[in-house]
Amino acid sequence: LMKSEPYEFSIDDLASRKNQTTYWEGIRNYQARNFMRDKMNIGDKIFFYHSRAKPLAIVGTMEVASEPYPDPSQFDPTSKYFDEKATEEKPRWFLVDVKLIKKFERPVTRDQIKEEESLQEMMLIKKGARLSIQPVAPHEWEKIHEMAGEPLPD
């Protein structure tokens, strides 16, 4: 699961990109970075979650479209994601490209997830679990699709 604030970058923004693909920049939390750098592989499926929105919701699915690579914004002094300690030789921050699979016609809200008995262990609803990138268990992936009325992507 990857979170984005829709006023910064929404699922509609992703849909409007060339090939419905973009890079997922700006991760500046080590645990989230490690998920992206060490656990994500090309073809892995991802939920797109709108955070700081009304309602908070899983709004669709994407897939990883590249191997992890250094986030170029860390080297750009004009970027809000600039990191003066990062160097080309020793980058600190990584990203992957993501490609839209499907925008849900019926997003699944955080409140709906909290009410679903089988999703009580989902990191998204755990107190203090604010990471912008989070793992999702296979049964959670399947249940969210069921709740959205969507078939599982290939």
Model segments located where?
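A cross-family signal for N-terminal binding/gating loops and helix N-caps
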Residues: L1-I11, A57-G60, P77, Y81
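Compositionally biased, charged N-terminal/linker segments
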Residues: L1-I42, E140, P151-D154
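Charged phosphate-binding loop/patch that engages nucleotide di/tri-phosphates or the phosphate backbone
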Residues: S132-D154
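Aromatic- and Lys/Arg-enriched surface recognition patch
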Residues: G60-L131
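Short, charged beta-turn/beta-strand-edge "cap" motif at the junction between a beta-strand
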Residues: Y49-L56
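A generic structural signal for short beta-strands and their flanking turns/coil linkers
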Residues: Q20-Y23, I42-D44, I58-G60, R92-V96
